[in-house]
UniProtKB/Swiss-Prot annotation:
PROSITE patterns: MFS (PS50850), SUGAR_TRANSPORT_1 (PS00216)
Biased composition (Polar residues): 42-56
Protein name stated in the entry: MFS transporter PfmaC
Membrane disposition: Multi-pass membrane protein
Disulfide bonds: none
GO BP, sorted A to Z: melanin biosynthetic process
Its job: MFS transporter; part of the gene cluster that mediates the biosynthesis of dihydroxynaphthalene (DHN)-melanin, a bluish-green pigment forming a dark layer in the conidial wall that protects the conidia from UV radiations.
GO molecular function: transmembrane transporter activity
Organism lineage: Eukaryota, Fungi, Dikarya, Ascomycota, Pezizomycotina
Amino acid sequence: MSGPALEVAAAKTAEQGQVPVLAAAVRGDTKVSGDSIHAATTAVSDGDNQSSTMSGKTAAGDATSPASGSGSGGWFHWHEPGTSKAEKKLIFKLDWFLLSYSCLCFFIKQLDGNNVTNAYASGMQEQLGFGPGNELSWMNTYFNIGQIIGAPFANMIITVVRPRYWLPACLMTWSAFVLGMYRCETAAQFYVLRFFIGLFEGAAWPGITYTLGCWYRKSEMARRSALFVMSGVLGQMFSGYLQAALYTGMDGKGGLAAWRWLFIFDFILAVPIAIYGLFCFPDTPHKTSAWYLNSWEREKAVERIDSEGRKPIGKLDLSVFKRIFTSWQVYAFTLGYALWSLTVGSYVMQYFTLYLKATKEYTIPQINNIPTALGAVNFVTMLTTGFVSDKIGRRGPVCLAVGCVLIFTYSIFTAWNVPHRLLMAVFILNGVYGCYTPLLAGWVNECCGGDQQKRAFILGLMTSVGGAVVIPFQQLQFPSSQAPQFKQTHGWPSALAFVIALTCWTGLGIPLLQRRMEKQAKRNEAEHEA
């Protein structure tokens, strides 16, 4: 509530004993709870309908919500300029509980997705007699098949089942399958377990991205999405550090090789995170029963998303699919994510690991540790692009700039016969690829915010289609038996072509299409009103 409004309320409630509470709010006293201020302003409404409106919409906050898009503050700001202290407190709670669990869950997801590569390079290949076949590629393939099947349906389920039950349940289920891999002796056993890991992991990225979009404003999303995805980068990096440490200190303990211990430790790390999510994940604003949110904060959370044009979830019927498949967003963003997947950017850390192993110049701990530098570049790029895209209020220019960097790195991969140190530097620089995921996810949340079911389905469909197209592409162009140069299959030149297509589509195509469709929507609205 603004200062003048609170002063009027204070004057009107002097006889009701509410002045101390409202006066404290005027001073910006953060110790006054939202419930107290809400109760005070509600008391005003007993004799004044105008005050009732004021109390319902501006209690403990500013009367005008921060506008979506960029503000006038500095480049690096966590809250939009003009955000009230009470709303900042709400956002802090969301960051502390919602965002923290999201990051931890995605950390485990990426840890579990990358562990098989670290295990493969740390003795699993030799102990189980893998190679010169494509066992590692097939492990990736079965994982992707599971994600293709699981992601869209998981994200539709999350619109009717409380996320705080669904997401931790999926986390525990896929972690149980990860644990099972420590007993595997054949490639077929790995394939089965990797399929089920992918099936339940498919709920993580689209489900959490959907839930974040239910709580945060459009102008807040890119920064949070970037932090969320960066946690996955840390998961990839930590997998290398953990495998290196286990190889040094646990190899042979309990009769188990170090690569088997990796799967056991990954499961142990997942258990407390799943329990944390069960008790602290806040569901969605219209359904939340989070113990750490007071009544005013729950109302404010609903008001925040309503002001962004987002509606409560409707019933799930055929009309939902009609809305989805007649929209431009489903095709534009699914194509964008498919092109990103076909760059095989998410596998470059794996190929870097195999490259280091092929040189025969590095120890097992070094082979696991050095590729994490790629993750560090990924981390910094996500943070930077998140802030920049929020500041300028556009995703296209950022995608175009990052795409130009990727065109350079993939050109070096295509040439290949370059000095060893240059090739290593290019592998590391290629870490910029990862920022596309939060940029595209934030873009979807921005464009589809008014229709939560469409938004949820598109996020899931992006994951599934991305996995579907990369399965045959990875098998044909990037078989592990041809790693790391992939000369016979022309892997790197093929990926370069998709990098160029990705850069043009996300940097130029989607922004032009978005502007055209928004103008058309305004014309249709004007004609309808006429």
